[in-house]
Amino acid sequence: LDYRAARPVAAWEFHRVPASTSLSSLNRIGIDESGKGDYFGPLVIAAVFVTPALEQDLALMQVRDSKKISDGRILELAPDIRLLCPHSLVAIGPQRYNELYAKIKNLNRLLAWGHARALENLLQQVECDLAIADQFGDERLILNALQEKGKQIRLVQRTKAESDLAVAAASILARAEFLQRLDRLSQELNTTLPKGASPAVELAGRMVVKKYGRDRLGTVAKLHFKTTKQVLGET
């Protein structure tokens, strides 16, 4: 895995575009992630290809930013979006996440690597010259992580990108995959692993350590969170 963001920006380009600018008349790829603020579970990045015609279908389905939709509705919408739109998913499980984070020690670079891989994978399925992602960190992070196909694309990074239906659809697919994987981890441990990073999450972490030992924590949780010190009583 080449997670290093070492290449300079060359022929491809990035654009910082106001959130109010509409790109709905264009074929485009939306990219979004889920799980970066959740102690338990994976980091998931989704990329979704949308045309103006597909956008109309998504609007009829009332697709919008996953943060504004209940988990139940997300799990209902995701299969329909998967059937309707070409897409790709990159899921980094907790154990692999911890290995990568230990090497690069920078969440934004890890996010950029995931965004780039999801975009590159989708470009194997579709022809598209425009992608939209939420703004995080240095704009060049995603661009530097792209390989040959991705270098040909115009990447728009902006705040509140989820207002674009392509990004909203990606946010739903990413969140649905996160929820399903978190549920599977909970079943494996016979312990409910809550979302987020709350006192309930800390309690669940302590239960995992008590039942299975400290090493098991690294297979279900993102260890660089300050929650880990609280779970292990190191604060």
What residues fall within each predicted segment?
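RNase H-like, Mg2+-dependent phosphodiesterase core
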Residues: L1-T235
